[in-house]
Amino acid sequence: MVRNEFTFPSADGRTGIHAVEWTPDMAPRAVLVLSHGVSEHILRYEPLAAYLTEWGFAVAGHDHLGHGLSVAAGAPRLYFGPRGSWDWAVQDLYARRELAGQRFPGLPVFLLGHSMGSFLARTYLIRYPGTVAGAILMGTGQMPPALVAAGRVLAAREARKVGDRHSSPLVNKLAFEAYNQKFAPNRTGYDWLSASTENVDQYLADPLCGGDPTIGLFREMLRGIACIEKQENLKRMNRKYDTERFYESV
């Protein structure tokens, strides 16, 4: 396996997006584009990439806006941008897919999104139908519309108090605290992330992981969730059998 790192311009017009490509030692038979979760970065997925390259898959990914090494000078971590910046993150994902397609012409391209990355992937599937051969959504979710609306109101209120470039202890508590309660007694504040204590410890030791997302990021993510849960948008996503092609090829 060979790892290659490079940057490409974000749709925000100011950030250089840190991108990674893992290429198998053999001729690749398909490409998988990864969309990572909140408060992490794409190199956390290198063990997965190593496994997939052994089976002949090329793997591509990038650090989302405000994550990992995709943070513009003077910008806070875990911040996409001003109102509407969810669209920038989705456009960056499309740009990464296009770069992967140019790098490996003629090969089927699949998309895998995890957690927040799954919400970005679902928005991608709505905005750019037919541009991937299939998609895998891990750690995704479905929120009642009333809860999404309440979250957006709360995020707007907190943003008015301290600004959207800052985090809110209240918003972060409501968003994440219940996850860890299901794994009490807790060893760390992130036990819910993985059944592997080694994986949790690696996350805690990684300076590019963790931290509280900004209010602006929560606002944008809730905006994205509201979009992907509309019935008319759900109907625009790829059908299940397209994704089954990926499992069959593995």
Stretch-by-stretch model annotation:
Residues A121-L208:
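Alpha/beta-hydrolase-fold enzymes
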Residues G81-Q102:
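Alpha/beta-hydrolase active-site loop
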Residues R103-S115:
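Alpha/beta-hydrolase fold nucleophile elbow
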Residues P47-A75:
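Conserved alpha/beta-hydrolase
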Residues L32, H36-E40, S115:
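Active-site glycine-rich loops that stabilize anionic/oxyanionic intermediates
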Residues G216-V250:
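Conserved serine/cysteine hydrolase catalytic core
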Residues M1-M26:
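N-terminal cap/lid segment of alpha/beta-hydrolase-fold proteins
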